[in-house]
């Protein structure tokens, strides 16, 4: 699932 505009959840 997209998270913060990326495929993986990363610090914004």
UniProtKB/Swiss-Prot annotation:
Major location category of this protein: secreted
Family statement drawn from the similarity comment of this UniProt entry: Belongs to the conotoxin T superfamily.
Cysteines engaged in disulfide bonds, as pairs: 3-12, 4-9
Domain of life: Eukaryota
4-hydroxyproline: residues carrying this PTM: 11
Subcellular location: Secreted
Native species: Conus textile
Post-translational modifications reported in the UniProt record: Contains 2 disulfide bonds.
Cellular component, GO, one term: extracellular region
Keyword line: Amidation, Disulfide bond, Hydroxylation, Neurotoxin, Oxidation, Secreted, Toxin
Protein name, entry field: Chi-conotoxin-like 1
Cysteine amide, modified sites: 12
Function: Chi-conotoxins inhibit the neuronal noradrenaline transporter (NET/SLC6A2).
Tissue distribution of the protein: Expressed by the venom duct.
Record PTM Methionine sulfoxide, positions in chain: 8
């Amino acid at each position: 699932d997209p998270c913060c505009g990326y495929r993986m959840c990363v610090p914004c």
